[in-house]
């Protein structure tokens, strides 16, 4: 991870609405979020004005696909149109001396992830703006949400076996070439034995029946791996990402080697406390000082806010309790992309197994269902099955190196199901820096080809021998991607091709065999 100071020009992150602030004197209205928030308005408008100009200019030549990235001498400008006319832009400083070498698509995936998580909890940004046209409500939700995401979202470090955060002190950690064998925006699946898979399917049916005739959804995780889901691929990725951040046994355990516990420096606490307030540099901070911005802001990504209750269900006070409301008003809720339904989220945990159960909120409001009744049904009907499945999986689990394949350092991505599998982080660290840089550059070439193809599937096969004699390989076919580094210097191109073929046959059902 490359460290970027929050006090200099190394990073700017903003979100703005092209439909707002087009009248002279009202330019500030277009700003929905800006990091660092304490920059003066003129600097914020300068960054957004340049970004807006680049978007407008590139649309002249490519109306259907506007600006994705602009490479300047000192900075990279990464663009992501989160919703129609609502843009997120990340401006990062180039600095090879600090290891700030990244893949643009990896940075764009950070923007996409934070937007997807925000929508899962709060709904679309455009809908919020239409609900409250001044933009005050939208900003009051965006500022703490993105700040919490940046300051506490945990990523498995490739340099050591522990969690690191985007913020370490006042340094912002961005994904670099060292994470090139990882794919944000995908889930990692657990491979099950046949008998265990049958038991899991039976458990899913039991969970579905706990709400009677109502259509529910469920997700099951073992540690940080997905076991089962009844959600769409997009909804699965969003909920899986949140679960790994805050709900799994690893996320809840205070004795794991997480930097959020080991690094309680002033920077971390400063960011946490600051995100409770309207940022000094935001246009809503003026109103908040006068007491006009006092509504309760839900901050789902706050750290250390979930605990396990005596009945096995996870509890949190993030959603609070509405005055005069029912206890159900404190239950977490999320939006599903596929059905546009608002769902209650219940989380149950037994050792390393975490179950997530989603139920439509309108059923609770209408009195068709009660949360307490569903919880009791889960305990009565599913607890023994859960215990047995957790025991079986734990007994057969190979640990953190379960998916290590001797001689290979790899990443496999299925874009249709949004599932990925890769070499364990500890094994990736054995690659030389030159190997990772070569692989990162190869992935950039594939990203460029995919961008030029404009969504059309295109088979690709690239095999390059780098200066340190490492072979880096990319194969893309039928929505699936394989990236690999082979550091056996004596291998010829034919040896390398055969090695990739053996890998494809044994571990990918022959998906990457090329004619």
From Swiss-Prot:
It comes from the Eukaryota. It is found in: Endosome; Prevacuolar compartment. This is Vacuolar fusion protein CCZ1 homolog A. It comes from Arabidopsis thaliana. Belongs to the CCZ1 family. Plays an important role in membrane trafficking through the secretory apparatus. In complex with MON1, acts as a guanine exchange factor (GEF) for RABG3F of the Rab7 protein family. Promotes the exchange of GDP to GTP, converting RABG3F from an inactive GDP-bound form into an active GTP-bound form. The RABG3F active form is involved in protein trafficking from prevacuolar compartments (PVCs) to vacuoles. May serve as a linker between Rab5 and Rab7 protein families in PVCs and mediate PVC maturation. Transmembrane segments: none annotated. Interacts with MON1. One of its GO terms (biological process) is vesicle-mediated transport. The keyword Phosphoprotein does not apply. Keywords: Endosome, Guanine-nucleotide releasing factor. GO terms for molecular function: guanyl-nucleotide exchange factor activity.
């Amino acid at each position: 991870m490359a460290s970027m100071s929050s006090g200099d020009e190394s990073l700017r992150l903003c979100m703005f609405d092209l439909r707002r602030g087009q009248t002279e004197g009202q330019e500030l209205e277009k700003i929905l979020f800006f990091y660092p928030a304490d920059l003066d308005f003129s600097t914020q408008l300068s960054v957004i004005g340049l970004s807006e100009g680049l978007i407008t200019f590139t649309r002249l030549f490519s109306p259907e696909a506007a600006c994705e990235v602009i490479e300047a001498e000192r900075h990279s400008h990464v663009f992501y149109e989160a919703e129609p006319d609502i843009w997120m832009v990340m401006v990062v400083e180039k600095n090879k001396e600090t290891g700030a070498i990244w893949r643009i698509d990896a940075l764009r995936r950070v923007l996409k992830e934070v937007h997807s998580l925000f929508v899962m909890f709060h709904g679309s940004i455009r809908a919020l703006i239409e609900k409250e046209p001044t933009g005050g409500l939208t900003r009051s939700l965006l500022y703490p949400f993105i700040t919490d995401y940046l300051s506490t979202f945990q990523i498995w470090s490739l340099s050591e076996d522990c969690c690191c955060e985007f913020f370490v002190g006042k340094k912002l950690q961005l994904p670099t070439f060292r994470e090139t064998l990882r794919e944000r925006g995908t889930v990692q699946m657990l491979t099950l034995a046949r008998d265990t898979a049958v038991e899991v399917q039976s458990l899913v049916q039991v969970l579905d029946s706990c709400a009677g005739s109502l259509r529910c959804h469920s997700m099951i995780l073992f540690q940080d791996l997905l076991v089962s889901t009844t959600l769409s691929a997009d909804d699965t990725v969003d909920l899986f990402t949140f679960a790994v951040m805050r709900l799994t046994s690893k996320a809840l355990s205070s004795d794991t080697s997480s930097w959020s516990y080991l690094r309680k420096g002033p920077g971390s606490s400063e960011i946490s406390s600051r995100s409770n307030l309207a940022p000094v540099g935001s246009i809503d901070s003026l109103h908040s000082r006068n007491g006009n911005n006092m509504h309760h802001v839900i901050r789902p990504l706050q750290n250390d806010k979930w605990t396990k209750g005596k009945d096995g269900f996870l509890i949190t006070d993030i959603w609070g309790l509405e005055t005069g409301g029912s206890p159900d008003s404190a239950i977490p809720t999320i939006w599903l992309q596929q059905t546009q339904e608002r769902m209650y989220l219940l989380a149950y945990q037994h050792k390393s197994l975490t179950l997530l159960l989603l139920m439509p909120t309108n059923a609770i409001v209408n009195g068709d269902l009660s949360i307490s009744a569903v919880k009791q049904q889960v305990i009565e009907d599913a607890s023994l099955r859960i215990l047995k499945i957790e025991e079986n999986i734990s007994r057969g689990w190979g640990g953190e190196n379960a998916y290590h394949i001797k001689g290979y350092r790899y990443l496999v991505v299925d874009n249709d199901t949004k599932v990925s599998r890769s070499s364990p982080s500890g094994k990736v660290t054995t690659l030389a820096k030159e190997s990772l840089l070569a692989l990162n550059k190869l992935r950039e070439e594939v990203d460029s080809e995919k961008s030029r193809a404009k969504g059309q599937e295109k088979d690709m096969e690239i095999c390059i021998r780098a200066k340190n004699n490492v072979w880096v390989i990319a194969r893309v076919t039928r929505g699936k991607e394989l990236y690999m580094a082979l550091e056996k210097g004596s291998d010829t191109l034919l040896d390398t091709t055969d090695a990739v073929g053996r890998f494809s046959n044994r571990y990918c059902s022959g998906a990457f065999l090329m004619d």
